[in-house]
Curated annotation (Swiss-Prot):
Expressed in leaves and in some parts of the flowers, mainly in the sepals. Modulates the competence to flowering of apical meristems. PANTHER family: FLOWERING-PROMOTING FACTOR 1-LIKE PROTEIN 1. This is Flowering-promoting factor 1-like protein 2. One of its GO terms (biological process) is regulation of flower development. The gene is FLP2. It comes from Arabidopsis thaliana. Overexpression of FLP2 results in shortening of the time to flowering. Disulfide bonds: none annotated. Belongs to the FPF1 family. InterPro entries: FPF1.
Length: 112
């Protein structure tokens, strides 16, 4: 069984396979998340815009044998950012990974 358990008015039910959309992570109850670049307030809407921002922060593309991933590394650290090649699979897990590795530059916000 996969899905999300929802408790509402004393009743618990399983909602199977909640929908997700690219670049915007859909949480239970219709909440969506976006990755925001703090200096400009811009919501990241594509990998090309994200790559420009990451490059300006010192991140470089890391080419590995995995064709399903886009990866970035920083020479000054051991950190590696791994993202799905398909932007429609970019969700809050990947967003928070970017935030943890760039805490003063990115933030995940609810978007309704």
């Amino acid at each position: 069984m996969s899905g999300v358990w929802v408790f509402n008015n004393g009743v618990i039910r399983l909602v199977e396979n909640p929908n997700q959309s690219g670049g915007v992570s859909t949480q239970s109850h219709g909440r969506r998340n976006v990755l925001v670049y703090l200096p400009t307030g811009e919501a990241v809407s594509s990998y090309s815009s994200l790559e420009q921002i990451l490059r300006s922060l010192g991140w470089e593309r890391y080419f590995s044998g995995d064709s399903d991933l886009i990866q970035y590394h920083k020479r000054s650290s051991i950190d590696l950012i791994s993202l799905p090649r398909d932007f429609s699979k970019f969700n809050s897990v990947y967003m928070y990974d970017i935030v943890v590795k760039n805490p003063n530059s990115f933030h995940v916000r609810d978007f309704n």
